[in-house]
Amino acid sequence: MRALTLLLLGALGFGAKAGEIDQAAALKLLQQPETVLIDVRTADEFAEGALPGAVRIETPDLARHIGALAPAKDTPIVVYCRSGRRSSAAQDVLEGLGYSRVVNAGAYETLAPAFSPD
């Protein structure tokens, strides 16, 4: 019984698992000014439109560049891409590097309306 209680408390405390898209958590995290927003799409995709404040770093380059953006491992980080697949891989990379507050926001097109002035 104790193990079940701990399991349930853990599920409540940690939200989405690595790789899972959690746009609600991402939008909430983006209300915090210290949150780093990373777009892992290609340069061409980014040029077609990006979320305000997003920094473009493709997933293979994350390990090389993340330290400059987020030196503290508890920095909140939100990642997104075109469909959610690359942002899932990016979340895995960041968590593998020790970042503890990474949220996969999924697809740009489903996030963009939350940032429109309408």
Where are these regions (language model features)?
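Structural scaffold elements adjacent to functional motifs in cytosolic proteins
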Residues: L37-D39
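Rhodanese-like catalytic fold shared by cysteine-dependent sulfurtransferases
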Residues: R2-T35, D44-P76, R85-D118
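Metallo-beta-lactamase
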Residues: V79-C81
